[in-house]
Amino acid sequence: MVKRADAGAIVAQLRVAIAPDDIAITLHHKLCHAARQLLEQTLPAIKHGNILEIAQRENEATCFGRRTPDDSFLEWHKPASVLHNMVRAVADPWPSAFSYVGNQKFTVWSSRVHPHASKAQPGSVISIAPLLIACGDGALEIVTGQAGDGITMQGSQLAQTLGLVQGSRLNSQPACTARRRTRVLILGVNGFIGNHLTERLLREDHYEVYGLDIGSDAISRFLNHPHFHFVEGDISIHSEWIEYHVKKCDVVLPLVAIATPIEYTRNPLRVFELDFEENLRIIRYCVKYRKRIIFPSTSEVYGMCSDKYFDEDHSNLIVGPVNKPRWIYSVSKQLLDRVIWAYGEKEGLQFTLFRPFNWMGPRLDNLNAARIGSSRAITQLILNLVEGSPIKLIDGGKQKRCFTDIRDGIEALYRIIENAGNRCDGEIINIGNPENEASIEELGKMLLASFEKHPLRHHFPPFAGFRVVESSSYYGKGYQDVEHRKPSIRNAHRCLDWEPKIDMQETIDETLDFFLRTVDLTDKPS
């Protein structure tokens, strides 16, 4: 036996079919019957030591947390099939699914999917008899339901009781609920993740974003937004402003960090001071004021782990010797992960750690940073193409990474902030795309192909070829590389109902297009 739920070896299994008409109570009876069968077969074998243990795939094992009322909201923008299955899952003996008409709560006890119903705004009443509600895809018929604490009745009777007519709108919360906007503090708001996350949050009407950074070029498009509040400054100087806003806000994302590999060997102490010491102070503010922190860990913490898939809960975190300063970023982040975890365990800090795996897209660094070598891979490669200099393949460019589109990454991060059912509390979540695995050499070739067919191609010099260079000559003697880095995204799927969707080629095309259109073409050949 092991202490974790749904972990350890399998000693007995029995498949239980879920029929289309099953609800929570009927499935419960099926599972009880199956459990009785298994115990009758297995307990004697355990007693006599005759069991055969089968190792399970730990990265596929799942468990679901305690049910909360949030699990029963009927969110009408979702597909009808999803809502129907939710009604089945939380029906008798549970309190069942619910929604509101104005301030009147009503419960749905049974439902039916109408996949080909006429299109209407999600949450709109399409018809009264049957009581048909438009969803994000298809429509849901409310077969039986209950108004408030009343009796269970047929859908058409429920519509009459609630005063519904064709075109009425349902909602997931009481209409009179005036919800204060959630205040989100983003330190490093002008950075790659910060500016894209700000855009996603401001797309909704229930977030107020407070940001600090040393520049504002990437967020200039938000500066006049009524729900965006920005101060230009350095986190090492503006400590009083930061403490005040940690106290004021609901969610804190300290995104400030030096995260470019060449800086790990070039300026290891600066990496430690900013990435560790400054962030530790912010973490302690969150503990002091009991604020939720969403902390950017990194895929770098896995280091030279040899697992096929890097798993948040099981993979070992392996780094090189002390005389390789390349690892100072990885261990700084790892120690902060452990500090946050300890504060959560011992002092009740509400936290989520997320680990990005090679996110890329528009506004990833800039070409000026790439000119001094202080940028991530794709931006450096684009600069080589723009300037007509050889693309440098460090140690042959055979290192493999899983590249993730910034839009996929931000959607996952947005869902962490939303934290439906508090499922993200105390979790470590990899955010990456295992399907987009490619070597740096392959990335370079895909980028080159996209560059050659770009409409602005004629403004730039001829391709200067690939050049293999040693990592020690490029990064310095304190560098070590990682051969592969592929995430398990089991936790992201379980906690966020998320999986990446965007193909790597699409990301490359859009990133290249963004940077080429930032280049001053007045001095370029035409």
UniProtKB/Swiss-Prot annotation:
Q: Which domain of life is it from?
A: Bacteria
- According to the UniProt record, where is the region Dehydrogenase ArnADH? 180-526
GO MF entry, a single one: UDP-glucuronate dehydrogenase activity
Residues annotated to bind (6R)-10-formyltetrahydrofolate = 2-6
Name the family the entry cites.
In the N-terminal section; belongs to the Fmt family. UDP-L-Ara4N formyltransferase subfamily. In the C-terminal section; belongs to the NAD(P)-dependent epimerase/dehydratase family. UDP-glucuronic acid decarboxylase subfamily.
State the name under which the record lists this protein.
Putative bifunctional polymyxin resistance protein ArnA
Kindly list the residues the record flags as site (Raises pKa of active site His): 6
Looking up Gene3D superfamilies in the UniProt record yields: 3.40.50.12230, NAD(P)-binding Rossmann-like Domain (3.40.50.720)
Record the organism. Answer: Shigella boydii serotype 18 (strain CDC 3083-94 / BS512)
UniProt keyword list? Antibiotic resistance, Lipid A biosynthesis, Lipid biosynthesis, Lipid metabolism, Lipopolysaccharide biosynthesis, Multifunctional enzyme, NAD, Oxidoreductase, Transferase
Biological processes per GO annotation: lipid A biosynthetic process; lipopolysaccharide biosynthetic process; response to antibiotic
Active site per UniProt: 300 (proton acceptor), 485 (proton donor)
- What does the subunit comment say? Homohexamer, formed by a dimer of trimers.
The task this protein performs is described as: Bifunctional enzyme that catalyzes the oxidative decarboxylation of UDP-glucuronic acid (UDP-GlcUA) to UDP-4-keto-arabinose (UDP-Ara4O) and the addition of a formyl group to UDP-4-amino-4-deoxy-L-arabinose (UDP-L-Ara4N) to form UDP-L-4-formamido-arabinose (UDP-L-Ara4FN). The modified arabinose is attached to lipid A and is required for resistance to polymyxin and cationic antimicrobial peptides.
According to UniProt, the reaction catalysed is: UDP-alpha-D-glucuronate + NAD(+) = UDP-beta-L-threo-pentopyranos-4-ulose + CO2 + NADH; UDP-4-amino-4-deoxy-beta-L-arabinose + (6R)-10-formyltetrahydrofolate = UDP-4-deoxy-4-formamido-beta-L-arabinose + (6S)-5,6,7,8-tetrahydrofolate + H(+)
Q: Does the keyword Transferase apply?
A: yes
Tell me the pathway: Nucleotide-sugar biosynthesis; UDP-4-deoxy-4-formamido-beta-L-arabinose biosynthesis; UDP-4-deoxy-4-formamido-beta-L-arabinose from UDP-alpha-D-glucuronate: step 1/3; Nucleotide-sugar biosynthesis; UDP-4-deoxy-4-formamido-beta-L-arabinose biosynthesis; UDP-4-deoxy-4-formamido-beta-L-arabinose from UDP-alpha-D-glucuronate: step 3/3; Bacterial outer membrane biogenesis; lipopolysaccharide biosynthesis
| Residue positions binding NAD(+) | 213, 234-235
UniProt region (Formyltransferase ArnAFT), positions on chain: 1-170
